[in-house]
Amino acid sequence: MSAVLVSKENNQAVFTCEIPAEDFNNAIEESYKKNRSRFSLKGFRKGKVPRKMLERAYGEGLFYEDAVNLLLPGIYEKAIEELELEPVSQPDIDLDDITENNDVKVKFTVDLKPEFELGDYSKLSAEIEEFKVTDSDVDMKVNHELESNARVQEVEGREAKENDTVSINFKGFVDDKAFDGGEAEDYELVLGSHTFIPGFEEQIVGHNAGDEFDVNVKFPEDYHEDSLKGKDAKFECKINSIKEKVLPELDDEFVKDVSEFDTLDEYKKDIKEHLEKDNEQRQLVEKQNKAVEALIEATEISVPESMIDNEVNRQFQDFARRVQQMGLNTDQYFQITNTSEEDVKNELRANAELKVKGDLVLEKYIEKEAIESTDEELDEQLKEFAKVYGKDDEEKFIEEFKNSPNVEFLKEDIKRKKALEKLVENTKFEIKKAEEKEDK
């Protein structure tokens, strides 16, 4: 079998292969043997019907599709190796008419890894944000600690107000008919969280525990459930209880309870130092990202949509895991936020394209700059891993890791880090001051 390249352009290749008649006939026989136990005909035991009898009864091409599928993976792999192609997607496959005792012609269409040359990266420049710790940043961190140590207590004798947590029963109606998903009991809702559709929470404010009342709202025109889009709705509601958050007193005693410090000033100073360290890392990541973006801008590169699709799907899975950590599934999240999977994926697409292009230009940069990982760097990284994962026998851990497939991923990671470091060193950065950002 030899592959014939029909075309190779715009990051896509089209090529053909011929399956020899003898190979196809053998695959038909193999398919028959594999599947015959599924068939029965009158006068024969199940699984014992001769192939020709089955083909006469069910059609001559009964086993053709399965026979081709048995052969295609091997044919495809040999073809891309012979033609020296780097596919980045599953191929589309077209078959000519298939008949027994004849060669089978197969056409493959597949997206390819882009071929490109890096642009001039000798004078890269980029604008980056200044990450500066302010007093308000420190106060925000302190307030977060206060919130974390707050207690929630039930209140009586006053109306519900914003930021209260209310336990409610509700049942929704559209055109005087209850609708699916519109009913709950003892639902805890934080007023002002905008968890529900516009107008719902505002009508809870001002009511007391024990009150029963109607809430009238209108579903948004872009609501995720088609049957409810733009519809007027009535919710029969009852407030079971009202709770408020009580923050602890911010003083030296609070500081002693939540930290190793004795005074509020010492505590705030430590918070500021930690925030500044965090900002150093944020600044480094910002420089790396902007340097890669500058390299992309200097390079003429287009990528197949399939590569972007794959990255969008990967990022969506990350998003779904984060939603799960919030105690929700994606359907619940979409209902609460009035969005859809398509909306989220559309939002991810621009960043996914940037990620794909960034990976490609950085890979090319590593190749052009001949960046390699050394044994010393590998050992140093593995020693760090041994510490992090609490491996007592460091030498054994390092030896086992070096003999595992994961060592190649680690080598690539080391090369990537070195490339980013070099790229940042050779990029001129203009820092956009915090005041400039506020003015814009």
Curated annotation (Swiss-Prot):
UniProt GO cellular component terms: cytoplasm
MF term (GO), any: peptidyl-prolyl cis-trans isomerase activity
SUPFAM superfamilies (UniProt xref): FKBP-like (SSF54534), Triger factor/SurA peptide-binding domain-like (SSF109998), Trigger factor ribosome-binding domain (SSF102735)
EC number: 5.2.1.8
Residues covered by the PPIase FKBP-type domain: 163-248
Keyword Chloroplast annotated: no
This protein's UniProt keywords: Cell cycle, Cell division, Chaperone, Cytoplasm, Isomerase, Rotamase
Record flagged with keyword Isomerase: yes
Alphabetized Pfam families for the sequence: FKBP_C (PF00254), Trigger_C (PF05698), Trigger_N (PF05697)
GO biological process: cell division; protein folding; protein transport
Alphabetical list of InterPro entries matching this protein: PPIase_dom_sf, PPIase_FKBP_dom, Trig_fac, Trigger_fac_C, Trigger_fac_C_sf, Trigger_fac_ribosome-bd_bac, Trigger_fac_ribosome-bd_sf, Trigger_fact/SurA_dom_sf
Reaction it catalyzes: [protein]-peptidylproline (omega=180) = [protein]-peptidylproline (omega=0)
Domain of life per record: Bacteria
NCBIfam families with a match to the protein in the record: tig
Domain writeup: Consists of 3 domains; the N-terminus binds the ribosome, the middle domain has PPIase activity, while the C-terminus has intrinsic chaperone activity on its own.
Function: Involved in protein export. Acts as a chaperone by maintaining the newly synthesized protein in an open conformation. Functions as a peptidyl-prolyl cis-trans isomerase.
Family: Belongs to the FKBP-type PPIase family. Tig subfamily.
Protein name: Trigger factor
Naturally occurring in which organism (per UniProt): Finegoldia magna (strain ATCC 29328 / DSM 20472 / WAL 2508) (Peptostreptococcus magnus)
